[in-house]
Amino acid sequence: MIKQTLRNPALRKRATQFGRLVRHSAVTPRQGQTHKPRLVTNGELGITFIGHASFFVQIGGKNVMIDPNFARWLFVLKRLRRPGLRIADLPAIDLVLVSHAHFDHLHRPSLRAIVQNNLRTRGVAPSIIIPTHVSDLVSDLGFSEIIELDWWKSSRHTNLSITHVPSRHWGARILKDSHRGYGGFVLKSGKHSVYHAGDTAYFSGFSEIGRRLSPELALLPIGAYNPPQFRNVHTNPADATKAFLDLKSQWMVPMHYGTFRLSHEPVDEPLQLLDQEAKAAGIKDRVVVLEEGVTRFF
């Protein structure tokens, strides 16, 4: 494999570029603070950004973790911002949602630690909701229930419904398991609803998600778009702005930026470009940039 890479100019270029990412991550000081979560009262919706695509969501009387990743390193890539919360400080978690099997979204050590923390604090493990054909990756982690959903299928948990929705991405964890599902989730309870897009490129499905489920708040990815071909599977800030307008949501919370150096745009660029795009679209007052670990109530 190494000899093949050295002989192939395209592979050699990619290896050189990846080496730059690794070196930049290694020498960049880790930033950010860890906080303790604030808990909701009076039926509020609570959103806590942990970093990357990870969120602690309080909705419908349930505590939900989405794509939890507390890793200090993603293989050779150093985490650039600390997780906003510690697993030990979490309240008992009812549900864990994982959007797809990629290593930065389905992080097995974090999932196992959440289960173990739940058993200590509550005596019962949480349930997990995943796309189709992903259960084998989480079956040994101790969850009380494993629920696989296909696109547009829903799972109900007392007053909370969770619907798995399409995205434009792919689900393989390694090269040979492209059968695995992928997508986003819409959580709805009473007057509150949240859409977590997972990983996705811009596509016409945003309009359909908005039309069918009308999410109040959209958690949308804005990073990992350079080189340009990455936009086949990721949204840049302009794409995320268009997606938000298609969804017709009230609030947008950006994610998938600044935590791991997954691509070649400057670390600070996604938020800077999002600010420009939001101003141009007249939605700046509806974009809420969350500090890791600081709970926002809606």
Kindly label every feature range from the protein language model.
Residues 68-71, 100-101, 133-134, 165-169, ...:
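Active-site metal-binding loops of divalent metal-dependent hydrolases
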Residues 57, 67, 100, 107, ...:
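Divalent metal-coordination and catalytic microenvironments
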Residues 46-49, 63-67, 161-167, 193-199:
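Active-site-proximal beta-strand elements of phosphoester/diester hydrolases
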Residues 3-4, 95, 102, 126-129, ...:
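Cap/insert and terminal regions of metallo-dependent hydrolase folds
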Residues 21-42, 130-192, 272-294, 298:
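Metallo-beta-lactamase
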Residues 30-40, 50, 56-101, 105-116, ...:
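Pre-active-site segment of Zn-dependent metallo-hydrolases
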Residues 44-46, 122-127, 192-194:
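Short active-site oxyanion
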Residues 1-28:
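Membrane-proximal basic amphipathic "stem/tether" segments
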